[in-house]
């Protein structure tokens, strides 16, 4: 051990370039999909970080519609986080197999509250919660001129000439029925009992977002972060009940006894849920987490733009080497890793994927988008959004202190491993994803990679020094017009 203390040399994104290779594939024809686990397939290899200025339900919905995945952060109460997951799962459905419903004796106020909370324009009405026989439907049109919200639903709901369909109705058949009768919601019934619901909005979304990442029921995929704190059991339970597809045990040091024990416990309790564990930076850590039961391991100790772990704690592994080492171990298990942190450009994404990552997790590149929950600020006439690390003092005070194993410390005793700042406002997420995936497609075209598996297996790197990096960026010119995919 003593003799090998300085034996390892490590590389990061700015130390390497991919070598171009003979290609017979055009960028527009490459396959960006990735199978992360038996139940989770993404159509782009991008995951938004579980950070309180990056991902809540709005971001997770937008990410899934683009074909990626969003991780709902845990800097909120258990019920609130579960509610955020529900918003994603109910935002879009092929067929809503478990629709909301109310009974005739409930008040219009309760209907208005339910519809407002989940942003739905109507709700089926059943005789009672046990039998669930459909007796009516309540829509915004029924409520348009209501002034007294204390009246019962039975007094205003539509009861006559209800249009319904059997439970095995396809989306194509449903669309024809909806158009024929000029209605927006089609209850699915069996022997009069409400069994499902198809809406015109969901059909329109299928057409508008054909690349969306969905579960087997046609609902958007969503992930949520948990930790190793006292509320983890109840948090995991509520998230699973809300329909979460992926649980992410999110800590700063995944190669620790507490995390390994938590992986074993969560996987035993919820074997059907895809489980991500991290963060780590070595093959040994990857091996231990996979053997404990993790389906996916998240890689990255300190590479993030808002992370100070490497300078505060003096610990980490430059990210390209960390990805490669962990991927080498993951190959032995036939499992996936996520490259988390350090990505500044689309070129870094393809480097991370070529080094062995199955997907990348992004924070700073997405924090400036409209869908992120960070507050908007105006600074020197330009629009920005607040972005902070989960190891920053503000985030730790709000609840992320357990991520850094400081759960029992008073706020004045926190030792932060991150900073708070601002990032330029970028507009809609879909525009950012378009540019990022355009860069990945271009890189795959240059390397002759038809899909991400081929990129991982066949692409080769060359190392470069500071002069090579300087040569790689625009030089000997003053940039006068900002590019949508480059800022330095």
From Swiss-Prot:
This protein's UniProt keywords: CBS domain, GMP biosynthesis, Metal-binding, NAD, Oxidoreductase, Potassium, Purine biosynthesis, Repeat
SS bond partners: none
Cofactors, names only: K(+)
Entry superkingdom: Bacteria
EC number, UniProt record: 1.1.1.205
Binding residue positions for K(+): 302, 304, 307, 471-473
List of residues binding IMP: 305, 340-342, 363-364, 387-391, 417
One GO MF term attached to the UniProt entry: nucleotide binding
UniProt function note: Catalyzes the conversion of inosine 5'-phosphate (IMP) to xanthosine 5'-phosphate (XMP), the first committed and rate-limiting step in the de novo synthesis of guanine nucleotides, and therefore plays an important role in the regulation of cell growth.
Family according to the record: Belongs to the IMPDH/GMPR family.
Subunit structure: Homotetramer.
Name used for this protein in its record: Inosine-5'-monophosphate dehydrogenase
Organism of provenance: Staphylococcus aureus (strain NCTC 8325 / PS 47)
């Amino acid at each position: 051990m003593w003799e090998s203390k300085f034996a390892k040399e490590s590389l990061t994104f700015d130390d390497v370039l991919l070598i171009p290779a003979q290609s017979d594939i055009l960028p527009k024809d490459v396959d960006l999909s990735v199978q992360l686990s038996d139940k989770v397939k993404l159509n782009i290899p991008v995951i938004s970080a579980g950070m309180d200025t990056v991902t809540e339900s709005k971001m997770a919905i937008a990410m899934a519609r683009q074909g990626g995945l969003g991780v709902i952060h845990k800097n909120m109460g258990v019920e609130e986080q579960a509610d955020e997951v529900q918003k994603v799962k109910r935002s879009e459905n092929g067929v809503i197999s478990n629709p909301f419903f109310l009974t005739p004796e409930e008040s219009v106020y309760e209907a208005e509250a339910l519809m407002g909370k989940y942003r739905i324009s109507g709700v089926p009405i059943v005789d009672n919660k046990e039998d669930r026989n459909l007796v009516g439907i309540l829509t915004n049109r029924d409520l348009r001129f209501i002034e007294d919200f204390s009246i019962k639903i039975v007094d205003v709901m539509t009861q006559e000439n209800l249009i319904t369909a059997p439970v095995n109705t396809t989306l194509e058949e449903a669309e024809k029925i909806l158009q024929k009768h000029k209605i927006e919601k089609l209850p699915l019934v069996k022997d009069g009992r409400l069994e499902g619901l198809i809406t015109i909005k969901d059909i329109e979304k299928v057409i508008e977002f054909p690349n969306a990442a969905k579960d087997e029921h046609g609902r958007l995929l969503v992930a949520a972060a948990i930790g190793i704190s006292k509320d983890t059991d109840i948090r995991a339970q509520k998230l699973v009940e809300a329909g979460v597809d992926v649980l992410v045990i999110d800590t700063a040091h995944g190669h620790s006894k507490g995390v390994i024990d938590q992986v074993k416990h969560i996987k035993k309790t919820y074997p059907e849920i895809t489980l991500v564990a991290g963060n780590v930076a070595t093959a040994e850590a990857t091996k231990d987490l996979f053997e404990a039961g993790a389906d996916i391991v998240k890689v990255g100790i300190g590479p993030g733009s808002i992370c100070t772990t490497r300078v505060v704690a003096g610990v980490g592994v430059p990210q390209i080497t960390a990805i490669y080492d962990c991927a080498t171990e993951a190959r032995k298990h036939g499992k996936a890793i996520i490259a988390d942190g350090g990505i500044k450009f689309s070129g870094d994404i393809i480097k991370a994927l070529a080094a062995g990552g199955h997907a990348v997790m992004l924070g700073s590149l997405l924090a400036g988008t409209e869908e992120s929950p960070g507050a908007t600020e105006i600074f020197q006439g330009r629009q920005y959004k607040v972005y902070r690390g989960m190891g920053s003092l503000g985030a730790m005070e709000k609840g992320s202190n357990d991520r850094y194993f400081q759960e029992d410390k008073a706020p004045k005793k926190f030792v932060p491993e991150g900073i708070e700042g601002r990032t330029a406002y970028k507009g809609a997420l879909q525009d950012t994803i378009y540019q990022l995936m355009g860069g990945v497609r271009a890189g795959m075209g240059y390397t002759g990679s038809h899909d991400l598996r081929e990129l991982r297996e066949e692409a080769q790197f060359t190392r470069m020094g500071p002069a090579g990096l300087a040569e790689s960026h625009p030089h000997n010119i003053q940039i006068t017009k900002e590019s949508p995919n480059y800022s330095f």
